[in-house]
């Protein structure tokens, strides 16, 4: 487990948040810890990306439902991060709804300066009587309840899974996430082997007492297989999207609060409700099926992140890619940088700072986490086309490292053509697997292998790579087409989705691609 002040990790998180279109994030300080060091690192990185010109998510904090704890924590948060006399640089990062005051989830402190500074929302706990003016971090009802806010209107919670068994909410059986996880089908033989004897009916009740990642509200059943599909999460989003589609403006959801990205605390507590005082239990996080993180994981990879992105786009809407007409003749672009400033050039910006070396300790403080694969920091890509060819320019922060013999992961350019099938992750071609002095290779990806189909002209000068691609090699025979692409430098593995997130630099990060849409004049 990494430490939450690992800058290498936090940079990845921020980039993913920006790509997802998140408007704000909330730090969970409900356990009365405010994570000073980690939050400062995160805020400073947000400022760095904002200064690069990116729309970064805003920030707020969520405190305890306990009034006394909340008052203390709110004051600590104000003093540590918000006090304008101490931290004026962070003022532009605070989430303010559609008014002027920064939001905070918690109780007023009694301090006039602090209380007049914030816009307060009291936290709604899922096992308490519903008060519609409060703020829901999770909802134990399905379909989820509607909450109200004077600024943003209807508010709704969307969560990955719900620990409703904590209060017997689901079927009258009191069970923690760990109880449901231990009573899952794959673990029942081990329970029997330890001398436990429960009826099949009771085992099923405990397993389904909580709503795991694969819980289906139609059948009221959990499923580990469905957990990889995110059935529960998708049904939660469906509640939001159905209200958006019904045509009634009064039903529109003004704010969706998603729980959650990750759990910074996974408490191991004594005395299992089901197995007795010889056994511990875990309330919020237990295993893949009974946990609520969206952040990437070795089992479900980026499934939940991409589901989040897709549903945010369905909720907020997304503009179509701009269409670019062919230029008369782009052949001069290979020798002249000025031509790339044309209005007919499509421009795609990537984050700077992604290639820092990782040399951190894990959360135990015992093991080092090292990643030194960062090499060429991709900053910008430009695309233009004429009747016969597509031209790409890739600009990096520093001079591009020379290609070393045998390096098949140097400045790879992955391409996908709309309407074509096969390949990998919607991409059918890759450039620069075997570049020469003046020409570079073009390979087609088929069945997790690379088949060379041609060569393309290319040049490298300083921090600029330019490539000229014959459309015929890509099977393009019309003026209207869609080109998907991504740039990756120094991947460590071929055909490995996880490697797109952790090795070298990829633009854009992870499984996503940029889109260039060409249109006839």
Residue ranges of each PLM-predicted region?
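Short beta-strand and strand-turn-strand segments in soluble, beta-rich domains
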Residues: 444-454
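Glycan-processing catalytic domains of CAZymes
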Residues: 1-330, 408, 452-454, 461, ...
